[in-house]
A protein has these predicted regions:
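Flexible, active-site-proximal loop/turn residues at the rims of small-molecule/cofactor binding pockets
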Residues: 117, 126, 143
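Active-site loop signature of alpha/beta-hydrolase-fold enzymes
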Residues: 80, 103, 119, 144-147
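Conserved class I S-adenosyl-L-methionine
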Residues: 138-160
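A short, conserved alpha-helix within the catalytic core of class I
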Residues: 120-132
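Short catalytic micro-motifs in class I SAM-dependent methyltransferases
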Residues: 112-119
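Conserved N-terminal segment of class I S-adenosyl-L-methionine
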Residues: 1-106, 114, 124-127, 153-155, ...
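Short glycine-dipeptide loop
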Residues: 133-137
């Protein structure tokens, strides 16, 4: 089996490791952080598959700014990405290079699963392991079964999701409904929030997104997607 996370192919295809999206994703999950119960003014956090480590750093900074002592661990299959995370976030206390089910520690107050579950083949088994690792789990799950992605799937002669797998390393593709169903099967959902990426792409100052906004068809997709979200029941 090809290990795209250690043969550098994933980083070659995604050289920024999505740092341009970090602030947007953090703002989406920030609303959940105040719900995490902190005992004795201390919190132990595990960031799984944290990419460049920027979202983990923002979470860590959030608790530090609130006067909380943080123990922060990063777990990843990729040794190179762990080095990048440590460089971007020197306050990481421990890096763990193994799969989730091999994690040598437990009793985490918070586990971060930000854009990770779609990469893991055994997602059901992984969810059970996560329940053993931590008291609170924050997921961010990309919604890739939607109106426009289905159109792209049909237009590509049913090859679109195969290409997405090669490009992004995604094994599973979720709709909003299937993501909620997955979470309910394995966890007690305390809160959830959905903000489509169209708003991020539409207003981000990131150079590639600025260029994309000059594309006529891309603009149509963004505007219609945002309109649907704003005008249909959620």
């Amino acid at each position: 089996m090809i290990d795209i996370y250690n043969d550098d192919s994933y980083i070659e295809k995604n050289p920024t490791l999505h740092t341009e999206d970090s602030e947007f994703k953090f703002q989406n999950i920030k609303r959940f952080l105040s719900s995490v119960q902190v005992k004795n003014n201390r919190i132990k956090i595990l960031d799984i598959g944290g990419g460049a480590g920027m979202i983990g750093k923002l979470v860590l900074d959030y608790f530090l700014e609130n006067g909380i002592v943080v123990t922060f661990h990063s777990l990843d299959l990729s040794t190179r990405m762990l080095k990048i995370q440590l460089k971007n976030n020197p306050l990481i206390n421990k890096i763990i290079n193994c799969s989730i089910d091999e994690c040598p520690e437990s009793n985490y107050d918070l586990v971060l699963m930000i854009d990770v579950i779609e990469h893991i083949e055994g997602k059901e088994y992984t969810a059970k392991i996560l329940n053993k690792l931590g008291k609170n789990i924050i997921y961010n799950i990309p919604i890739e079964i939607n109106f426009f992605d289905i159109l792209k799937y049909l237009k590509s002669n049913f090859r679109y999701y195969k290409r997405q797998k090669v490009r992004w390393g995604h094994i599973h593709f979720f709709s909003f409904t299937s993501s909620q169903s997955f979470l309910r099967r394995h966890h007690k959902i305390i809160d959830s929030y959905f903000q489509p990426y169209c708003f991020h792409y539409k207003y981000s100052d990131y150079e590639s997104y600025l260029k994309l906004r000059h594309d006529f068809f891309w603009n149509i997709e963004l505007n219609i997607s945002c309109w649907i979200f704003n005008n249909f029941p959620k």
